[in-house]
Regions:
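Conserved acid/base catalytic micro-environments in cytosolic active-site loops
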Residues: 1-308, 313-316
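Conserved class I S-adenosyl-L-methionine
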Residues: 332-340
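Phosphate/ATP-binding catalytic cores across multiple sugar-kinase/actin-like superfamilies
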Residues: 129-132, 317-329
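Surface-exposed acidic, glycine-flexible loop patches that form ligand/cofactor-binding
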Residues: 19, 328-332
Length: 340
């Protein structure tokens, strides 16, 4: 995993605040480099054409040569495969590929395109896209890291998991070049490590769970696929949520009942997706009967934040209200101020 000092530099496309996505289907972000085209061919050969998902492929392409990757992939799938060179709305059952010398980002339900910065010292195109995917599509994003050299994709994949999405890495012994998958796995944030031929079925299972899952309403959790309308089911869900937090406190010693509700729901929803469970009562039963699940849920609850100053309102209040007072205090002229 990257150290904090190696945080991903802001790209031109990231200077604007990412708007949440309005899309009601999963967006699958796929990062690949050396050996990645062969892995992509196997993935799309095994992916049904009418799967209801969208795929965005970010590869390390030479900025000095045209790429025919989209034409090669089109030979193994009936989904529409497009190489992106201009802003493009994302549609289901489509595959979008990065163009040479370009950077892809996601904003709302669109792909944005900017010219790649030639001064950028290392490949981070996958990280940058996956971070915007996470911020835009949140718990309905999936990040996949395939064959490649280096570590691009590891930080972006971690961000997807932080925002409630699901993460997958190609099994290293199945990858032609295993550095990128191994780097992703080393973050501890990968949900599934699979041979590339098994990834399509996993995606189908995840999408099936997403569109049937039911959770209590919360204004800050994007749930376009399902909602609980029945009052009795809503009460049962709220009771199950309380029981889940009680179980977690009993087994881990950590009490999350005062945590932000949206964060708690997002973390539990992620575990429900991973375990293919459709509602909170089902997850409560799974948690009761699966002792090791408490450890996984706790890890999700305590997942590290991958952005500095992530809570914008809190830091703006700190800048506006607190810091000026510290330096305006009479004793501040002779008293050191420590920042860490």
């Amino acid at each position: 995993a990257r150290a904090m000092s190696e945080e991903i530099p802001a790209a031109e496309g990231l200077k604007l605040k990412v708007q949440p996505s309005h899309l009601n289907f999963p967006v699958i972000g796929i990062g690949a480099s050396a050996g990645g085209l062969a892995a992509l061919l196997r993935l799309f050969e095994n992916m049904p054409n009418d799967n209801g998902m969208a795929f965005v492929v970010v590869m390390h392409l030479s900025p000095h040569h045209e790429s025919s990757a989209h034409e090669i992939l089109q030979k193994v799938t009936k989904m529409k495969v497009r190489q992106i060179s201009e802003p493009t709305p994302i549609e289901r059952n489509c595959v979008y590929l990065i163009s040479p010398a370009m950077q892809l980002t996601m904003n709302d339900g669109y792909l944005r395109v900017t010219e790649l910065n030639p001064a950028q010292p290392r490949h981070i195109a996958i990280d940058i896209f996956m971070r915007t995917l996470a911020d835009a599509h949140a718990e309905h994003a999936v990040a996949i890291v395939l064959s490649g050299s280096g570590s691009d994709g590891s930080a972006g994949l971690s961000r997807v998991k932080e925002q409630g999405g699901v993460t997958i890495a190609q099994a290293p012994d199945d990858a032609e070049y295993d550095e990128m998958p191994r780097s992703a796995i080393a973050t501890g944030q990968v949900d599934f490590i699979l041979p590339v031929g098994d990834i399509p079925q996993k995606l189908i299972d995840l999408w099936q769970t997403m569109r049937t899952m039911q959770l209590p309403a919360d204004a800050e959790v994007a749930t376009p696929f399902r909602s609980i309308d029945d009052p009795e089911q809503s009460r049962a869900a709220e009771t199950a949520l309380k029981d889940i937090l009680t179980l977690l406190r009993t087994r881990s010693g950590h009490d999350f009942k005062h945590y932000k509700r949206a964060t708690v729901l997002r973390r539990i929803e992620r575990r429900m997706q991973v375990n293919r469970l459709g509602d909170l009562p089902a997850y409560r039963a799974f948690l009761q009967n699966t002792p090791e699940e408490a450890r996984h849920l706790l890890a999700d609850m305590l997942i590290g934040v991958t952005n500095f100053f992530r809570d914008r309102e809190a830091f703006e209040a700190l800048e506006r209200e607190i810091i000026p007072r510290v330096f305006d205090m009479p004793e501040s002229a002779d008293t050191p101020v420590r920042v860490w």
